[in-house]
Amino acid sequence: MSATVHYKDIRKGMEKDLESLFKKYDSDRNGKITYIEIVETLRKAGKKNPERIADLLFRDDTDKNGELTIEEAKLRIVRMNDEKIEKVLNWDVEKFINDNDKDGDRKITRDEVLQRFTEQGAEDPELITDSIFRQMDLDRDGVITCDEIKEFNRKKKFSFLKSSAPKQ
């Protein structure tokens, strides 16, 4: 599969994610989301600092009318070239490694992931850890590397809105 096809697939996935985002936040179903709609929805969901997330989304309000349309949000995707998308993918991989690699060896062990979920009070950290390793430890050597994460992202539908990394 060529890199161009891969990035087109990512763009399509991003557009679907945007459509889902609009369905979730457009409380009055007028095809536009307001800053207040985003903040209120995030607050109801128990998110901390909903204004910060709304600020990030509203960078795409190109006409600065206080309403974000799906077309405005899609412009960001169009403006992203393949190089930028690859940079974002690599940043996500780096962030996942940095968030979970406790000993700095650039590999994530099962114990490191298990410790992370246990510290966060996950309901079943063993089950979550096993699931992550079944999917991402491609060579079954007990560690997850940057290359395995990149390969996992290539094979799976990549989503910018659904992080594969544990939440902080």
UniProtKB/Swiss-Prot annotation:
One Pfam short name: EF-hand_5
Domain EF-hand: 13-48, 48-83, 88-123, 124-159
UniProt keyword Metal-binding, yes or no: yes
Residues in the signal sequence: none
CDD domains: EFh
InterPro entries: EF-hand-dom_pair, EF_Hand_1_Ca_BS, EF_hand_dom
Chain positions recorded as Ca(2+) 1 binding sites: D26, D28, N30, K32, E37
Keywords for the protein's UniProt record, in alphabetical order: Calcium, Metal-binding, Repeat
Coiled-coil regions listed in the entry: none
Name used for this protein in its record: Calcium-binding protein 2
